[in-house]
Amino acid sequence: MKWFLSLVVAGVCSAQSAEVGRWADHWADAYGVERELVHAVIEVESGGNPRAISNAGAAGVMQLMPDTAAAFRVRNRFDVEDNVRAGVAYLAWLRDLCGGDRRLMMASYIAGQNRVLRLGLDFTYSSEVHDYVTRVAYLYRRNRWETLLREGVETR
């Protein structure tokens, strides 16, 4: 019986993961945000769990705070499509606001754009922010490398 439940849970998790991946790719393409970056943010924020809730009150796959969700017209933060759409739209908005600087984008995503833009590039004031930016950057590079290998592009 245990093995059966494990298979059922694994199947549900795989289906959930596939759904998250499909919406991540769809909205990344729609908003012109790199797929690899969106997947890195999702992995760090929630591990792809649509039911994730943080101690600060962020919820869903991309861990949207209530105010951010409201600004991007999210009705249900636990709805995968709506959450990913809003999260990617927010990343696109941050990209434009931060002049394309991924470090500032990621620092703004975790700490809030007003706080980060006020401090400029000195987001090392917080070990949480620094660790977050470092982790997303690592996963982004890993995801990018995997994409290049999958596409058969030679790397140097």
Each PLM stretch: what is its role?
Residues M1-F4, E34:
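Generic N-terminal initiation segments characterized by hydrophobic and/or small/turn-forming residues
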Residues S14-R156:
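Catalytic glycan-binding domains that act on GlcNAc-containing polysaccharides
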Residues W3-V12:
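Sec-dependent N-terminal signal peptides
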